Design a protein with these regions (language model features):
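Twin-arginine (Tat) signal peptide motif
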Residues: 3-17
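C-terminal segment of classical bacterial N-terminal signal peptides
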Residues: 20-29
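Short, glycine-/small- and polar/acidic-enriched structural segments
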Residues: 32-162, 167-172, 186-189, 206, ...
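Extracytoplasmic/secreted envelope proteins and their assembly/folding machinery
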Residues: 53, 79, 83, 94-97, ...
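Short, surface-exposed acidic
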Residues: 64-68, 163-166, 262-273, 306-313
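Pocket-lining segment of extracytoplasmic ligand-binding domains
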Residues: 95, 168-169, 174-262
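Secondary-structure end/capping motifs
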Residues: 227-306
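Conserved C-terminal helix/tail region of periplasmic/extracytoplasmic solute-binding proteins
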Residues: 300-335
Length: 335
């Protein structure tokens, strides 16, 4: 049997095939992911409450989306998980996210989970170290790629020193604190709640503080995930907002989650949350662009970012406020 294909038949068939391809493609783009991965971290207290409450699972259960929680011990680990795709949402410091973005990490900063003073330079109670200048030739515990690391580099720069003038000892944050109090290092670029713990329990001294050098706590999302699933991103941020507002209304309960998760005493959690954590403004925007541009300019000057880095363009590429802005508009319309 011979099948005759006319030009008209061919055209109609091509149109039908194209329409089918568009339909299949659209369906694939709209299909919900099977799983969402996000982190929790002791430096992001709201994430601890959110994980324990089960509100993310509650939000996505009706879609059949599984939720996987991963512990980030520092911004470096969160960025590693984001880059590898094991999580889609990760908590970092703003400065760490900026450096990660410059190094090719495919992320967008979409939300402010806190405005902290979570890092300082710390030494032992009986140490002779009084200023940053005294760190020359000393062993300093630090976690590379985190806000404490960037804080240390900027503090050294202000004192006319570089990282080459000290002896960095590379440890994760909890191990750095333990190394300090055991005398294995002379100083530590600290991070709460570990910093507050050693300050209260062993008399560790915060010998150099500068709140302006602490960059904001930002929630990041993988770019590809956000592009494919903007509604999921907005729903996740809406749940984060529920947890943030609940935390502000129930500070004692939030403190309890930090005590439980980080296994610290109540007085330690009280110092971190009561004195050094601000949850008031979750909307990432111009304030944060200015702060990260200033920090990025310094990081470029001291060699953390490449000399030819266009810092304003890098910051603009990192920060994406469209999701939280839409969430705010939706919530305002519901009031």
């Amino acid at each position: 049997m011979t099948i005759k294909i006319t030009r008209r038949t061919f055209k109609l068939g091509s149109i039908a095939a194209a329409a089918l391809a568009l339909t299949v493609g659209a369906g694939a783009a709209q299909a919900a992911p099977e799983r969402i991965g996000l982190d929790y971290a002791y430096y992001n207290p709201v994430s601890l409450l959110l994980k324990d409450k089960g509100w993310v699972e509650e939000e996505f259960k009706k879609d059949g989306i599984d939720v996987r929680w991963v512990l980030s011990l520092g911004s470096n680990k969160a960025l590693e998980f984001l880059n590898g795709g094991s999580i889609q949402f990760g908590s970092t410091a703003g400065g760490a996210a900026l450096v990660g973005k410059a190094n090719g990490n495919p992320i967008k900063a979409i939300y402010i989970y806190s405005r902290p003073e979570w890092t300082a330079l710390v030494t032992g109670k009986d140490s002779g170290i009084k200023s940053v200048a005294d760190l020359k030739g000393k062993r300093v515990a630090v976690t590379r790629g985190t806000d404490p690391h960037l804080f240390l580099l900027q503090a050294l720069n202000q004192a006319g020193l570089t990282e080459k003038d000290i002896k960095p000892v590379l440890l994760q944050h909890p191990d750095g604190g333990r190394a300090l109090v055991s005398g294995q290092v002379d100083a530590w670029a600290g991070l709460d709640p570990h910093m507050a713990k050693h300050e209260l329990q062993e008399g560790a001294r915060l010998f150099h503080r500068d709140p302006a050098l602490n960059t904001y706590g930002v929630l990041n999302v993988r770019e590809d995930f956000a592009t494919e699933n903007p509604e999921i991103v907005e729903r996740l941020l809406a749940v984060y907002e529920r947890a943030r507002k609940y935390s502000l209304e129930n500070p004692d309960e939030l403190r309890g989650y930090l005590v439980k998760a980080a296994k610290v005493e109540d007085e330690i959690a009280k110092k971190q949350l009561g004195e050094r954590t601000d949850l008031a403004n979750p909307v990432i925007g111009e304030e944060h662009r200015k702060a990260l541009t200033a920090a990025g300019t310094v990081l470029r000057e001291i060699g953390v970012l490449k000399a030819d880095t266009d810092v304003p363009a890098l910051v603009a590429d990192l920060i994406d406020d469209q999701y939280i802005q839409r969430v705010n508009r939706q919530q305002a319309a519901q009031r």
